[in-house]
Amino acid sequence: MSYKPIAPAPSSTPGSSTPGPGTPVPTAGSVPSPSGSVPGAAGPFRPLFNDFGPPSMGYVQAMKPPGAQGSQSTYTDLLSVIEEMGKEIRPTYAGSKSAMERLKRGIIHARALVRECLAETERNART
C-alpha cells in the first residue's frame, strides 16, 4: 500500500487565493519531510530502524569491545535470537500475522548468525 498525496484542485480564476498545482500548500497537520531539517528540531532526521543487515528482533545489539572473542559474542547473539524466536511460536500458531513476520525475520537473522559461527569455526580450525 503506497501513499500518494492529494494535489489541490486547480483554480479557475487567475486572482484567487487558492494556490495553483505547482505551488506547495502548507497545512497545520502536515508531516515534516525526513530529508531536511525541521525548524525547532534538535538535529537532522535519524530513522529509528536500520535497513542494513539482518533484523535485530527488536533489541539493540551491544558493540563488541576491542578485545572480545568474536565467536563467543556471535554465539550468544544466536542464542538470544533463538530465545526471542521461541516467544513467537505460540502466537504464530494462534494466527498472529505480526508474530509470524517476527518469526520469519528471526529465522533469517539466525541463519546469518549460524553462517558467521561456521565461518569463525573454520577460521579457528585452520590455525
Swiss-Prot record:
Q: What is this protein called?
A: Cyclin-dependent kinase 2-associated protein 2
Question: Which portions of the sequence form the region Interaction with CDK2?
Answer: 65-107
Which segments show compositional bias classed as Low complexity?
9-44
Pfam families with a match to the protein in the record: CDK2AP (PF09806)
Q: Which organism is it from?
A: Bos taurus (Bovine)
Region named Disordered: 1-49
Q: What's this protein's function?
A: Acts as a component of the histone deacetylase NuRD complex which participates in the remodeling of chromatin. Inhibits cell cycle G1/S phase transition by repressing CDK2 expression and activation; represses CDK2 activation by inhibiting its interaction with cyclin E and A. Plays a role in regulating the self-renewal of embryonic stem cells (ESCs) and in maintaining cell survival during terminal differentiation of ESCs. Regulates microtubule organization of metaphase II oocytes.
GO cellular component terms given for this protein: cytoplasm; microtubule; nucleus; NuRD complex
The gene name reads: CDK2AP2
Similarity comment: family membership = Belongs to the CDK2AP family.
Any one Gene Ontology BP term: regulation of microtubule cytoskeleton organization
Tell me, how does this one assemble? Component of the nucleosome remodeling and deacetylase (NuRD) repressor complex, composed of core proteins MTA1, MTA2, MTA3, RBBP4, RBBP7, HDAC1, HDAC2, MBD2, MBD3, and peripherally associated proteins CDK2AP1, CDK2AP2, GATAD2A, GATAD2B, CHD3, CHD4 and CHD5. The exact stoichiometry of the NuRD complex is unknown, and some subunits such as MBD2 and MBD3, GATAD2A and GATAD2B, and CHD3, CHD4 and CHD5 define mutually exclusive NuRD complexes. Interacts with CDK2AP1. Interacts with CDK2. Interacts with MAPK1.
On modification after translation, the UniProt record reads: Phosphorylated by MAPK1 and CDK2.
Localized where?
A: Cytoplasm; Nucleus
Q: Which UniProt keywords apply?
A: Cytoplasm, Nucleus, Phosphoprotein
